[in-house]
Amino acid sequence: MESHKPSTNKDDLIFNIIPRKIKQLPESDRNLLEYGSAYIGLNAAFGGLIANSLFRRILNVTQARVASSLPMAVIPFLTANLSYHSFVSLPLSTGNLNCEICTTTRGTLVGFVLGGLYPILLAIPVNGGLAARYESSPLPQRGNIFNYWITISKPVFRKMLFPTLLQTAFAAYLGSRQYKLLIKALQLPEPDLEIQ
């Protein structure tokens, strides 16, 4: 018979300890740790719908409301949700991210780039394609396409400044809060294990 040594591998310990400690947290704190990325995704979806609406008004697009609103809500939601989960929540819960500033910075970057800027940039080709298809707005000739879209996009970026900053601040706060909740969970005493 082989002597069976207990696993002292750091990864095994972390994968066993962190989920067990998180289960000891109150339900509201546990939900924030587990579903925080969905909140970031929902904010990104709302940002996508707002950007879609602003571009539709500027380009005078009145047809295909659902055809443009559906991808402008679903794609930013999925992108921001999965990115925040991959870059912030998952590394936190596996012990690969152990610095509050790092967590806040990652959350801020995901919130700004994928929750704020990405929905605005995604709205440009969606609504540009609809404007070309329904001929609701005169589109530029080949030489000045870039200048045309910059001119069209400036008012949208100005109006989307507050939602983008709000998304960025919320993602930074959520990253910091998730880190503090994880530290709180790790400081909880070990539950009494009954020996049978």
From Swiss-Prot:
InterPro entries: TMEM126 (IPR009801). GO terms for biological process: mitochondrial protein quality control; mitochondrial respiratory chain complex I assembly; optic nerve development; protein insertion into mitochondrial inner membrane from matrix; toll-like receptor 4 signaling pathway. Protein required for the cotranslational protein quality control in the inner membrane of the mitochondria. Associates with newly synthesized polypeptides and may act as a chaperone that cooperates with OXA1L for the insertion of newly synthesized mitochondrial proteins into the inner membrane. Required for the assembly of the ND4 module of mitochondrial complex I. Residues 1-34, 79-106, 177-196 are mitochondrial matrix. The chain crosses the membrane at residues 35-55, 58-78, 107-127, 160-176. Disulfide bonds: none annotated. Interacts with OXA1L; promoting cotranslational quality control in mitochondria. This is Transmembrane protein 126A.
